[in-house]
Amino acid sequence: MDSLVENTLERLVNRVATSYFGKYRGVVTDVDDPNNQCRLRATVPAVLGEQECGWAMPASPFAGDGHGFVMLPKVGSGVWIEFEAGRLDNPIWSGGWWGSGERPDPQSATVRVIVSEKGHTFILDDESDEVKLVHGSGPEIKMTGSEIVLTCGACEIKITNENISLNNGLIKVGLAGVSLVNGAMTFGVPP
């Protein structure tokens, strides 16, 4: 009986000694997945030193045939690496982490933000009750409960429940007709 207990303990110790459970900080080294599955490679210093892990599968919020959540970090970004069933040959990347000062703006608990490397930004702002899509070079679309505003340089189109306004009211299109230059000329709809 003692040899059975010893044998079981020895196998258990060996299993624990060669298993890696939990999350480990990694740094992305390659995102050019030859299988096109959103896998990446990373260094995981706490486990592998400076050696890269194998191709890590994504732990995506959802994925299926031809649909899902697709966002890959760039090379040099911080990622969390796990190992399926604790095995080093089955890496998984399950998210990212920011170093000090790397978090994108805006920084609020009520604002959800997706920012690309080139600054293209999607903002869900519960604080201001608006949704905003901003191109990295400046043009933007802003939506609230009562209006949609498209801005590109000095040009602006504002759509409300009652009218469409171009360039801060220089042209207005509404149910009653069209007005130009703040009322200088009006084309109405016959009564």
Give the location of each predicted region.
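Beta-strand/loop nucleic-acid-binding surfaces
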Residues: 49-70
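Conserved structured core elements
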Residues: 18-22, 70-73
